[in-house]
Amino acid sequence: MKLGAYYKGGDLKKPSGGKKRKVRRTKKKALGGGPPQIPKLGEEDVRIVERVRGGNIKVRLREAKYANVYIPKEKRYVKAKILSIVETPANPDFARRNYMVKGAVIRTEVGKAVITSQPGQDGIINAILIE
């Protein structure tokens, strides 16, 4: 009977008593791109260009001051200044922290609007006027 078979230690030892080593190093793709970078209301538009999986590039929005607001009655877009974030269905805390995500209701110079783009992914804020 082998005593190695009954050894119940940490995961760093093999049944034979030998040390376990890493199979491979931690690769960049396994880290998942880091923590989420949610755009905030700021004094000016701040964008970062980032390399993503496959060698592609993605323009991310860090801070925003303006939004492209679509006015359905007039069938045109207007570049409007964002005054505040009214509510965010994704997370109530986002509105308090001035985070802008898809579906958030923002107050602009032309009225209230709902964000239709993904600012953190697209690098721009598109919205539709609701008032």
Curated annotation (Swiss-Prot):
The gene is rps8e. Residues 1-38 are annotated as: Disordered. Residues 16-30 have a biased composition (Basic residues). GO terms for biological process: translation. One of its GO terms (cellular component) is ribonucleoprotein complex. Keywords: Ribonucleoprotein, Ribosomal protein. Belongs to the eukaryotic ribosomal protein eS8 family. It holds the Pfam family Ribosomal_S8e. PANTHER family: 40S RIBOSOMAL PROTEIN S8 (PTHR10394). It comes from Pyrobaculum arsenaticum (strain DSM 13514 / JCM 11321 / PZ6). InterPro entries: Ribosomal_eS8 (IPR001047), Ribosomal_eS8_CS (IPR018283), Ribosomal_protein_eS8_arc (IPR020919), Ribosomal_Se8/biogenesis_NSA2 (IPR022309). This is Small ribosomal subunit protein eS8. One of its GO terms (molecular function) is structural constituent of ribosome. The keyword ATP-binding does not apply. Part of the 30S ribosomal subunit. Coiled coil: none annotated.
